[in-house]
Structures are given as structure tokens and as C-alpha cells.
Amino acid sequence: MAKGLLIVNLGSPVSPETKDVRRYLREFLSDQNVITMPKALWQPILRGFILPFRSWRSATFYKHEWTQAGSPLIAYTQVTRDRLRERLPDWDVQMAMNYGGEYPIGETLQTMAARGDAPIVVIPLFPEYTQSTTKTILDKVAASGVKTVVIDRFYDHSDYQKILAQQIDDAYEAGAYDTVILSYHGIPTAMVRHGDPYQQECETTTAGVKQYLKKVPQTKVEMCYQSKFGPVPWLKPYLRNRLMELAALGKRNVLVATPSFVADCLETLEENNVQNYQTFRANGGKNFATVRPMNGCEPFCDFLAKLAEDKIAAEANHGKA
């Protein structure tokens, strides 16, 4: 009997072809943890307007970023899994995806349980908790019927914040930047009003990272939100708008880090490296650079392995109490 570890990320289409992107978007945007509008109202909009137009456009973006290893998000999650296996040789380390058909959460957990894995630690690869990512993963974990131990967030761990700070310091040292932006995936403000802790946790992440920065003056650091979808208000400031404002203010050299993304994906590779870069340059900006996500880097894998080991130790001590 081995201890089990399951890391879970968002997911990806199985290919960058429009039909597969459409299938992926239909699954993702039908999740009521993501889109809270009543199904009777939302599904006609989704199927009649959004999927016909957004699928081919998103497929174009996926084709830009697709690699020989496939989706960057899945490829980097595989790197993370493999490096965790090196660090935890006595564990059964697996990965799952919330959407997309590959690496389904429920089937993966049931296979691990059938092999006798116990206990099984589940780590959603989202540092900050929110309904639209972590909760929907935990719903599927619960639906599997497999007994698990869940680490549902890790934004406030000092070791994690130190890794982020080191990455930002290293990137900052390579260029003369006027502003360093920590950009998080946005969520609708209605979710926060209804009690979602995401905004507060993002702010705590930013404060913690600033505390550990050694080369970046804290006065140069600010935070934004990106990837807005739909007409309803989302958390502000919006990254795209802020980039235009900074360029207008003469802040022509900007470095962007994305703490809520632990692996490269469309939001980092296409939205930031292409679209936001172009927006910044078109409005008078000069130097736009990004800090790459963790992408299975050694310090992050060290952190995740220790997180899992500490969780098991804490559960064992709790059981003895």
C-alpha cells in the first residue's frame, strides 16, 4: 500500500482543432461553478452565440501555442508530476484535469484507490481558492467516492511566496522596469460579494511576495486582474486597461508576473505575451516582459512534495490525538 498524491489542473482541448476546442469550451462554460447564470438562460446563449464564434477564435490561439508535446498546460503539469515522482519515490503520484477528457479526476482517483493507495492527497494547482477553479475540482473529488485528504490552497505559505519573489527578482534584474505587476486571473465581482475569498487571498499573496522581494522596490509593485469574460463586472483593475494607463503616464517598461497560473497556458502565452504586449506597445510602451509561471521548476516541486508530506504527517498526528 502506497501513499497517493493527485495534482489537478484546469485542463485543455485534446487538440487545437475547432471541434475539440468547441467540445472543451462547452464543458468548461457549462459548469455552474464557472457561469452561475441559470442553465435555462445561459445554455441558449452559450450554444447559439458563444460557441459558434469563440471556438474557432480560441482554436487559432491554441494552434499558435501548441507544441510537439501538446498543450503547454498539460505538458508542464506532466513535468511537475514526473519531478514529484522523483521526490516521492514511495508514493503513487498522478495528475488529473478538470476539463477536456484527458486525465479525468474521478477515474484517476478510483484507479489509485483500486491499487490500494491510502491516504490520497489531492492538490489543486491553484494557489488561491475560488469557486470557479478549486470548488469545481473538489466537487468532482467528492463525487468520486474516494477518501482523500485535500490541500485546497497554498497562497499563504511562505516557501511558495519566496519562490515567486525569487522568480520576480531574477526577471527584474535582467531589465530596467518602471513597474512590476502581479496579475491574477479575474473572477466576477458577484462571486466576491457572495463570499468567495479569492480577492482577499490574491491580495495576501501580493503582500507576502512583496515582503520577500530583495531587488524590486516595493513602490514599483502593483496588482491587476486579467482574462475577463462576458459583460458583467469583474475584479479590477483590469490588466489591459492598466497597461494603457501606464504607457500614457510614461511608464514604458513593465514586468508582469502571474501568480495564479502555475503553468503556461493561453492566458500567459497568448493573452499576455501577444495581446497585452501589443496593447502596451501600441499605446506608447517600450519594454514589456513576463515572468514565466512555475512550469514544474525544481523549487516548486520541492515545495509541493513537502506540502504533501506535511499534510500526511499532520493527519497522522491528528488521528493519534
Curated annotation (Swiss-Prot):
Fe(2+) binds at H185, E267. Its EC number is 4.99.1.9. Pathway: Porphyrin-containing compound metabolism; protoheme biosynthesis. CDD domains: Ferrochelatase_C, Ferrochelatase_N. It is found in: Cytoplasm. The keyword Lyase applies. The keyword GTP-binding does not apply. Pfam families: Ferrochelatase. Signal peptide: none annotated. One of its GO terms (cellular component) is cytoplasm. GO terms for molecular function: ferrochelatase activity; metal ion binding. It catalyses: Fe-coproporphyrin III + 2 H(+) = coproporphyrin III + Fe(2+). It comes from the Bacteria. InterPro entries: Ferrochelatase, Ferrochelatase_AS, Ferrochelatase_C, Ferrochelatase_N. Keywords: Cytoplasm, Heme biosynthesis, Iron, Lyase, Metal-binding, Porphyrin biosynthesis. GO terms for biological process: heme biosynthetic process. NCBIfam families: hemH (TIGR00109). Belongs to the ferrochelatase family. PANTHER family: FERROCHELATASE, FERROCHELATASE, MITOCHONDRIAL. HAMAP family: Ferrochelatase. Involved in coproporphyrin-dependent heme b biosynthesis. Catalyzes the insertion of ferrous iron into coproporphyrin III to form Fe-coproporphyrin III. This is Coproporphyrin III ferrochelatase.
